UniProtKB/Swiss-Prot annotation:
Pfam families: Ribosomal_S16. The lineage of its organism: Bacteria, Pseudomonadati, Pseudomonadota, Gammaproteobacteria, Cardiobacteriales. GO terms for biological process: translation. GO terms for cellular component: cytoplasm; small ribosomal subunit. HAMAP family: Ribosomal_bS16 (MF_00385). Belongs to the bacterial ribosomal protein bS16 family. One of its GO terms (molecular function) is structural constituent of ribosome. Disulfide bonds: none annotated. Keywords: Ribonucleoprotein, Ribosomal protein. This is Small ribosomal subunit protein bS16. The keyword Cell membrane does not apply. The gene is rpsP. NCBIfam families: S16 (TIGR00002). It comes from Dichelobacter nodosus (strain VCS1703A). Transmembrane segments: none annotated.
């Protein structure tokens, strides 16, 4: 089954997450089909905190992709900030 979820990157004590489309059986940080955006929970200064490609997320969802709870909340947050 296809999953749209977070994949952790960054260094110790400074996480950085990529939003990826991947097979749900794959390990969290292993191979992915497509990178759909990123989330930087500890953005500093001018660093961007969140960027998502909503068109591609909708495409993968139409192909049967299951969106994780955390990614759903990030999409909601992204849409809210885009309306400002």
């Amino acid at each position: 089954m296809l999953a749209i979820r977070l994949s952790r990157g960054g260094s110790r004590k400074r996480p950085f997450y990529h939003v990826v489309a991947t097979d749900s059986r794959n390990a969290r940080d292993s191979n992915f089909i497509e990178r759909l955006g990123f989330f930087n929970p500890q953005a500093r200064g001018q660093e961007e905190e969140l960027r998502l490609d909503l068109e591609r997320i909708e495409y993968w969802q139409s192909q049967g992709g299951q969106i994780s709870d955390r990614v759903k909340s990030l999409i909601k947050q992204y849409k809210k900030s885009a309306n400002k």
